[in-house]
Amino acid sequence: MDTKSLLVTGYRHTDLGIFSEKDPRLHIIKSAIRRNFIRFLEEGVSWFILTGQLGFEYWSLEVLEDLRAEGYQLSIATIFPFENHGEQWNEANQAKLARFKQVDFVKYAYPRYENPGQFRDYNQFLLDNTTGCYLFYDSENETNLKYLYHMVLKKEGYNRKTLTFEELNEEAENFSNSE
C-alpha cells in the first residue's frame, strides 16, 4: 500500500450491537485491527486519520495508542465533522471523545451542522487529504457509511483496505485454534 496518510473509519458500535467493553467480539476486532495496523506501519503509513466516531474508530484509536506505547512511530489526527461533535454523548462516551481530542492533530470541518451537503463535502475533504483508507464495512450491511464507501470506490488511485466480517471470522478461528 503506497500510502502515507490513512483514513480509518467503519461501523459504529451501535451498528454492530456492541454496547460493552467486555463484549467478546472486541478482542477479535482489535486483534484484526492490530494485525492490519502493524502491516500498514511496515508499509510506510505514518498518519492515521480518524473522524471521532464510537465503535471501529474508537477501537482503532485504542490499538494505535497501544502500538505507540510499544514503540511504533505513528501520528494520529482526528478531524471532526462539527465543532460540537459528541456534545450530547453520555459521560462514558464523553471520556472517549476526550481521547479523540488528545491526539497529535485535531480539527473541525465546520462550526456546526447547517445542511446535508456538508457531509458530502466533509467526506470529499477526507479523501482529498489522505492517500488511502482502512474501512470496516460490508456493502451487504449498509449504514450511512455507504456514502463515503461509494466515494472511495470511485476515487482513482486511492488505496483501500476493507476489513470484512469474513476476515473477522477467520481471525476468530485463528484465535480459538491458538488457545
Swiss-Prot record:
Gene3D superfamilies recorded: 3.40.50.450
Highest taxon above the source species: Bacteria
Pfam families: YpsA (PF06908)
UniProt-listed InterPro entries: YspA
Similarity field: Belongs to the UPF0398 family.
Protein name as catalogued: UPF0398 protein SSU05_0416
Protein source organism: Streptococcus suis (strain 05ZYH33)
